[in-house]
Regions:
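Catalytic domains that recognize anionic headgroups
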Residues: 1-223
Length: 223
């Protein structure tokens, strides 16, 4: 029997906020996955740009081999999404409405694209995307399946949900946002049969050093 694959990538997620002993974010679900799974502490991004770095993740090739950039998707390069589909997998995605992701997932079985470019309308996990993902998982996807999700919640400038914007969830707004993401990871895991599903979590790249912790002027899609 082929395993299902739940593949979640976070834009601008720093490794030290996940497994460093000095992290201040609260991440019981990430800690569980690290404890029960495999954690790669020396995985290094091939680029600081989303399209280039994820192009490498999806093809196991360097950017100068893929020809994939954030603004120029090379459809002639095979990704493992295509390979898995050829092997009978049903392909699902929840991605931002950016050209790179739309072209990447154009031939998926089903795809949900959320607003990102118009920042004043941008919905994040707490603004509806999280519930949409849970609803899709609750529908019991046709097996075997791979469900790819890319989340922009950590991409600056980001909105911290009010219930997580507290010191107990981290010293900085970034740390608190990671705590919020972990909460949603827990909700997703509740809908997944871990006995027959491979769960993969990654970032595209890290973030600025120091972190660009600038609070947006508006916060319409938050609670």
């Amino acid at each position: 029997m082929k395993s299902n694959i739940f593949f979640l990538t976070f834009d601008s997620l720093r490794a030290d906020k996940i497994y460093d002993k000095n992290k201040t974010s609260v991440t019981p679900n990430l800690d569980f996955l690290i404890d029960k799974g495999i954690c790669f502490t020396q995985a290094i991004s091939t680029s600081d740009a989303t399209g280039l770095s994820l192009g490498s993740v999806f093809t196991a090739k360097y950017p100068f081999k893929t020809g994939i950039t954030h603004f120029n998707y090379n459809s002639n390069v095979s990704t493992y999404f295509q390979i898995l589909k050829e092997q009978g997998y049903h392909t699902f995605a929840t991605v931002p409405d950016i050209s790179f992701f739309l072209k990447l997932t154009a031939n998926f079985t089903e795809r949900d694209a959320y607003v990102y470019d118009k920042r004043e309308l941008w919905a994040q996990l707490v603004g509806g995307i999280g519930d949409s993902i849970v609803n899709r998982l609750e529908t019991k996807l046709n097996e075997p399946w791979i469900y790819f999700i890319h989340l922009m919640d950590l991409h600056a400038p980001f909105y911290v949900p009010l219930e997580f914007d507290l010191e107990k969830y981290g010293k900085t707004r970034y740390d608190r946002m990671v705590s919020s993401l972990d909460f949603w990871i827990g909700k997703f895991l509740q809908e997944i049969d871990l006995e027959k599903t491979i769960v993969v979590l990654s970032a595209d790249h890290g973030d600025y050093i120091p972190i660009n912790d600038v609070k947006p002027n508006k916060q319409k899609k938050n609670s």
